[in-house]
Swiss-Prot record:
Family: Belongs to the sugar phosphate cyclases superfamily. EEVS family.
Known role: Catalyzes the cyclization of D-sedoheptulose 7-phosphate to 2-epi-5-epi-valiolone. Involved in salbostatin biosynthesis.
Protein residues bound to a divalent metal cation: 209, 280, 296
Nucleus is among the record's keywords: no
GO biological process, one term: antibiotic biosynthetic process
Assigned keywords, A-Z: Cobalt, Lyase, Metal-binding, NAD, Nucleotide-binding
Organism classification: Bacteria, Bacillati, Actinomycetota, Actinomycetes, Kitasatosporales
The protein's Enzyme Commission number: 4.2.3.152
Metal-binding among keywords: yes
Active-site feature positions: 167
Binding site for NAD(+): 66, 97-100, 130-134, 154-155, 167, 176, 194-197
Name of the featured protein: 2-epi-5-epi-valiolone synthase
InterPro entries assigned: Dehydroquinate_synthase (IPR050071), DHQS/DOIS_N (IPR030960), DHQS_C (IPR056179), EEVS-like (IPR035872)
Length: 410
């Protein structure tokens, strides 16, 4: 309707040329809460039941629980809902990147239909890691064109990244999160006590996303990881010592606040230059091609190592800063190189990211430690030179683990 006369009806509805055309403008107010709580399944803790409303006599909830979480916490979860008189159906789902697909999503929809949730007053509840939260978030966004839901992340990467934003999605056609929506959970409850049963590798996996925030916006957070990273790995954010507890609380708060601070003004990604995309230019392709060898945070760390080298070669970092970054990656027991990093793979990854970012690279690079800039001119030759140096630095820094590299993603 550009260039035509619009008549305002004072209600957000406009008509043109004696009602031969209309323009409707509407806004939707979005708010959601992220809350830190220790021990959310204690009987006296009612945070999980605040959303929605009960039906006469008894409230009802449909709960999706990760299969590993169910093994460790299933009895406690069921006892909690029984204690509060909640009629709940618990669906146990195996969730990993290979099962993050439409088939898993539609299985959940089938079970929701069988349970018969009320559209608005019986929010879905998801308890699990980032993969399961992404799937259930997508289901919630599509079910009856939008159902409320509550998230309880049980992994570190869920607490600091996947559980605090609004993205949902599943993998499709070999691409990570190719199908998805922007749908906030009504409430996210972050309980670090779940991390006590997480294996060491998955603590490191989440620390990679914390390191991302540190490198692009928070030098003090980087210094905290530099000083306390091994303790956080050892104590799994449980605060077994007074110093470890202070570090765990401070690092979690800084990482979550930093992420939300970046998301809030650009929640729907109208602006495609996003500093929180640091580490996510090459990693989606690298992660999918390396499945199941690399976890998400590990792929992000490999990406950050590559872009750290690119930044150093461009004079955005000193050699000392570059080496500090690689040293922290090693201290957090994260990989800083992987054999999948063939130059052709990286070029293909960058091309796909350019399409995702609407025709430009919009590649975030660290400026010093705690700053960021965006570039659009990285070349295949530059990638090849950078990954060669990355391999030299990564081979020297990446810890050689002898134990199981798998583990439960609770």
């Amino acid at each position: 309707m550009t260039g035509t006369s619009l008549t305002d009806t004072s209600s957000g509805l406009y008509f043109r040329d004696h009602s031969q055309g209309w323009l409707l403008r509407a806004q939707k107010q979005i708010s959601y809460e992220v809350r830190l709580r220790d021990g959310i399944f204690r009987p006296e803790c009612t945070d999980l039941l605040e959303q929605g409303a009960g039906t006469p006599g008894r409230s009802r909830r449909f709960v999706v629980v990760d299969s590993n979480v169910d093994l460790m916490y299933g009895n406690r979860i069921r006892s909690y809902f029984d204690y509060h008189g909640v009629d709940c159906s618990i669906m146990v789902v195996e969730a990993n990147e290979t099962l993050k697909n439409l088939e898993t999503a539609t299985r959940i929809v089938d079970e929701i239909d069988a349970f018969g949730i009320a559209r608005r007053k019986e929010p879905l509840i998801v308890i699990g890691g980032g993969v399961l939260m992404d799937i259930v978030g997508l289901v919630a966004s599509l079910y009856r064109r939008g159902a409320p839901f509550v998230r309880v992340p049980t992994t570190l990467i869920g607490l600091v990244d996947a559980g605090v934003g609004v993205k949902t999605g599943v993998n499709f056609n070999g691409h990570k999160n190719r199908l998805g929506t922007y749908t906030p959970a009504d409430l996210t409850l972050l309980d670090r006590q779940f991390l006590a049963t997480l294996d060491r590798r998955h603590i490191g996996n989440g620390l990679a996303e914390i390191l991302k925030i540190a490198l692009i916006k928070d030098l003090s957070l980087f210094a905290a990881l530099e000083e306390h990273g091994p303790t956080l790995l050892d104590e799994k954010f449980q605060g077994s010592t007074a110093a470890g507890d202070r570090a765990a609380r401070s690092v979690l708060h800084s990482a979550i606040h930093g992420m939300l601070d970046e998301l809030q003004p650009n929640l729907w990604e109208a602006e495609l230059e996003r500093c929180v995309d640091y580490g996510h230019t090459f990693s989606p392709t690298v992660e999918m091609r390396a499945l199941p060898e690399l976890l998400h945070g590990e792929a992000v760390c490999v990406d950050m190592a590559l872009t750290t080298v690119i930044a150093w070669r461009r004079g955005l970092l000193t050699e000392a800063q570059r080496d500090r970054i690689f040293a922290v990656m090693a201290a957090l027991e994260l990989p800083s190189w992987h054999p999948i990093l063939d130059p052709d793979v990286l070029v293909n990854a960058l091309q796909d990211t350019v399409r995702h970012r609407d025709g430009l690279q919009r590649l975030p690079l660290p400026v010093g430690i705690g700053g960021v800039t965006f570039v659009n001119d990285v070349t295949p030759r530059e990638l090849e030179a950078a990954v060669t140096l990355q391999q030299e630095l990564g081979d020297a820094r990446t810890p050689k683990t002898s134990g199981d590299r798998g583990g439960r993603n609770l």
